[in-house]
Amino acid sequence: KTSGVTQNTAADDLEMRARGGIISVQMTSLWPRLEPLLPRVEKPARYIGCEDGANANIYKPDATSWLLTYPDTYEIGLPNQGLQILYELLNERPDAFAERSYAPWTDMEAQMRAANVPLFSVDTHRPANEFDIIAFNLSAELVYTNVLNCIDLAGVPVRAAERSDTDPLVGAGGHCAYNPEPLADFVDFFVMGDGEEVIADMTTAVGEWRKSGKPTGSRESVLHALARIPGVYVPSMYDVNYDDQQFSGIRARHADVQQRIPKRTIADLADWPYPRNQLVPLTEVVHDRLNVEIFRGCTRGCRFCQAGMITRPVRERPASQVREMISAGLERTGYDEVSLTSLST
C-alpha cells in the first residue's frame, strides 16, 4: 500500500469489500506506471499522497467526484487553507468525494509526458480525466499558464468549446475568479466568493447530470443548470462585448440565467470550523505549521487592495472556537507553531 487506496488485485478488492469497504474494482490507478518514475525526480514525496489528515481513501462510485487542483507545486499548494476546507467538506458528503492534485515540477512533468502518464490525484493516483469536475484555485494571475498546462496534462481539451460530454467540467475559484475573462475560453465555470455553501448546490446539479448518464449533447444542459446557481459564472451562457479590446458589457443568453452574478458569502464563521483535520505534509512545504482562520474580510477598506474589497463583510470567529481549534489541531498534528490567519490581524 503506497497511496491512499490499496492498488492490487481483484482478490484484494473483494477482501476490502468483505470488511465493509467500498473501494470499486472499476477505479483506475496510475500507480504501477507512476512508481517507476519517482526515482528519477527530485522530490518523490510530492506525488505519493498518504499525508496525515488525508481523507479521500474511500472511493464512492456513485458520488460526484471533484479533483481539487492547486496550479503550483505541492510545497506551495498543500498548505492552502481554502483547498483543505473544500476537501474536507466534500468528503463529509454522502453524494460527493474530493481528491487533490498539484502541478508537477518540471522534472516530473517531463517524465510524465515521456511515459504518457496524465495528471493524477495524489490521494489515489486516479487520472484527472476520470473525475466529474477539475476545480482550480486561482490564487494569483501568475498561475494561469500552469492552469492551461494542467488541463493539457490531464488529457482534456484546453479550450472549453472543444470539450465533449465525456470530458470533466473545468472550474475555478479564488480571488482571481473575480476577473474571469482572461480564462473564459478555457474554464467552464467560475465561482465568486466563499465556496463552503456553493459546492453543495453544484454537487447536486452535477449529480443529476451523472444520474442521467451524461447523454450526448447534455454538457450544455449541466452548464445551464450551474449558471442558475447564485455565485457561479458560466462563460458559455453569456455574450461578452468588447470595444477595441476593452470590456464594454455582458448579456445572459437565457432568461433564467442571472444577469448579474452575486458573490457567495457565508454569514457566520462559527458555523464552519474547518479544516478540522489539517493535512500534515510528507516533505517540507511553505507555511509548515498549524493554520487557524480567525476572521475573513478587512475593516480597513484600502482602495488599492483587491482582497480587502472582495472579501467583505468582516466576519470574526469566536475566541472560544479559535482556542478549541488550536488545542485540537496541535494535539492531532504534532505541530508546535500556530499561524492565526486573516487579512489584517
Residue ranges of model-derived segments:
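Glycine-rich beta-alpha loop elements in corrinoid/cobalamin-binding modules
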Residues: 103-252
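N-terminal [4Fe-4S]-dependent radical SAM core
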Residues: 38-67, 74-75, 241-291
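Structured alpha-helical segments in the cores of large, soluble enzyme domains
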Residues: 54, 125, 170-173, 177-180, ...
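Conserved structural-core and active-site-/substrate-pathway-adjacent residues in large, well-folded domains
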Residues: 90, 134, 138, 147, ...
